[in-house]
Amino acid sequence: SEMCIRDSPWTRKTLENGLRPELAAKAGNALQKYAIENTRLGIPVFLAEEAPHGHMAIGTTVFPTGIGMSATWSPTLIEEVGKAIAKEIRSQGAHISYGPVLDLSRDPRWSRVEETFGEDPVLSGRLGAAMVTGLGSGDLSREHATIATLKHFLAYAVPEGGQNGNYASVGARDLHENFLPPFREAIEAGALSVMTSYNSIDGIP
């Protein structure tokens, strides 16, 4: 659903022709009604939204990027950000948040460094867990809770030559000591979804 409600040059949606929050909520409700009433099993659908530093949609709050939020060193503040994001996502009828980004940005040439919480696995893990908690820890029975999607599994931010999507040369020890712990901590906080990366690691896709 993100493609119809956010302002972006790729989708050619703007503040003038995109969906405002009220219309986005109506569109989400219409999709659910159709899925329930016009499909064989009548199963409601999950709607997902991009949320790297706020719900990426028209009429929502834009927070600092991940690298900016990490400069606060404040899990409490990041949890509050997560709560605000979850409320805006759920108020427009969606359930899944694409975020937080837990890539460890160790190569400044990589084009997505600003999405991350930086290079430190401990800080990334703490802030990632705080964001997941703020997003609602996947408990959709709560009024403003979403399912957090952790990005990008695994070792995505260290591509050869800094080129996005390129292969990563990372050994098993580095993976286990540095790249995996932030994901583990966020999963223990309640994340229910993980987005895979687009790279190969030591030649293994």
Over which residues does each language-model region extend?
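Glycoside hydrolase catalytic-domain context in secreted enzymes
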Residues: S1-E2, R6-P205
